[in-house]
Each structure stands twice: as structure tokens, then as C-alpha cells.
């Protein structure tokens, strides 16, 4: 099965509620790799890579998020493999610094 890569932007009340940690833990548990970070505009950005059904399921879960989050929108776009280079060396899924 071929791998797909999606760049996902999540907006709403998604900072200060454990969203990045939840996303990283959930994605890793599902066998995905990539990264997640806060953005200064209050949104969360993630890159998810893996098989199409698993990436699609994770994007659907992003619409709910952790219990304290209030997600308003999730936008996913096709991403190029080079975006995965932002991960920390040796990690399957990284939590990056705010951009």
C-alpha cells in the first residue's frame, strides 16, 4: 500500500488544551509519522504520513481532538515528502516549536 502525506491545519480553541500532545500520541499509536506544532495565529499545523485509510481516519479524529479542544475547522492538503524533514532525528512523530 502506498504512503500519502497530508498537511493539516486545525483552527478553533486548539492551543493550551493539550492538542499537540494528543495528536502526536494518537498519530503514533495509529502507526503514522510526521510532526505537529502550534502557529502564532492560534491554529495547530500537522503533517501526517502513512496509508490512506489511516491518514483519513486521523484527519477525522482531528475534527474532534482532545476533550478540552473546540475545533472549528480542519483543512487537509496534499504535501510533499520534504515536509517530513522537519522531524527531530530518530523520531517517527515530533512536536515542533511554534512557528
Curated annotation (Swiss-Prot):
Active site: 20, 38
SUPFAM superfamilies documented for this protein: Acylphosphatase/BLUF domain-like
Keyword Phosphoprotein: no
Keyword terms: Hydrolase
Reactions accelerated catalytically: an acyl phosphate + H2O = a carboxylate + phosphate + H(+)
Gene3D superfamilies: 3.30.70.100
Keyword Acetylation in record: no
Record-annotated Acylphosphatase-like domain positions: 5-97
Pfam families assigned: Acylphosphatase (PF00708)
Record-listed E.C. numbers: 3.6.1.7
Record InterPro entries: Acylphosphatase, Acylphosphatase-like_dom, Acylphosphatase-like_dom_sf, Acylphosphatase_CS
Molecular function terms, GO-annotated: acylphosphatase activity
Sequence similarity: Belongs to the acylphosphatase family.
The protein's name in its UniProt record: Acylphosphatase
Species of the source: Rhodopseudomonas palustris (strain ATCC BAA-98 / CGA009)
Amino acid at each position: 500500500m502506498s504512503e500519502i502525506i497530508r498537511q493539516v491545519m486545525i483552527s478553533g480553541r486548539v492551543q493550551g488544551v493539550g492538542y499537540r500532545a494528543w495528536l502526536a500520541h494518537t498519530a503514533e499509536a495509529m502507526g503514522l509519522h510526521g510532526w505537529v506544532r502550534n502557529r502564532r495565529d492560534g491554529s495547530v499545523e500537522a503533517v501526517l504520513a502513512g496509508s490512506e485509510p489511516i491518514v483519513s481516519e486521523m484527519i477525522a479524529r482531528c475534527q474532534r481532538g482532545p476533550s478540552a479542544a473546540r475545533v472549528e475547522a480542519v483543512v487537509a492538503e496534499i504535501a510533499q515528502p520534504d515536509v517530513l524533514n522537519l522531524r527531530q532525528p530518530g523520531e517517527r512523530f515530533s512536536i515542533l516549536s511554534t512557528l
